[in-house]
Amino acid sequence: MKPILFSFFGVKILSYTVFSFLAIIASIFYIIKNLQKQKIKIDYFDYLFWTILFGALGSKIIYIVLYPNQFDFSIFYSGGAVSWGGIFFGCIAAILYLKKHHLPISKILDISIFGLFIGIAIGRIGSFLNGDGYGKITDLWIGVKIPKVDLSPRYPAEIFESMALIILLITLYLIKKKQKLQTPGLISLIIFSFYFMIRFINDFFKDNFHRYCGLTFNQIFCLFGIGVIIIFIIWRKHGFWSESRFFKSTKRKIRKKFEKT
């Protein structure tokens, strides 16, 4: 573990902060580059600002709600975040922004979510170095010691997740290069589907004492997420949901408001 990466003129530079910064930069770079490649006209920085802001706040808010006894203002810069909160609030902010500006939601979300999970893969390394999300005690050679917990070798659960995400993203990238997965929204569904499975399995390796019916909050959320994806696929297959209908409903509501005034 290395929560303090290095010191610069007496200032301690935290691993979590450095890798969070690298994660954000990598995500932004990928998203902007691919939006430009697709020639999508959008205010990149305005879109990313609101998405990242709500994502960051969401991850902290959910952490405070789930672990109120561990609240400390230091969580806003040194760890203490629930990724689901960030993903959920960030996606909601992105969808609302794209809907407001009448931009192709599925197409842009495919790029944004791919970029987001590049960031998560990098961010997990920072969490590992900070000693967060530590695994159960193990006798295997892969065990690592977490000094702030104890000196028993434990599963490097955060590294497991990071490696699984890297493999998933590289695989999808190679498939995309062959001009496959062209259906808007398909990449997002694949990433979320696999990520739910990765998190569900990985949590069995984590030493998480907050369990409900034998499952962690993350695992319960994963099951819920998989259910939502299945329902969404069924809706889309039977034509109950489409972006054009989504935008038409918005225009109709706006028109009604103007008619009332």
State each model region's role.
Residues M1-T261:
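Hydrophobic, membrane-interfacing alpha helices
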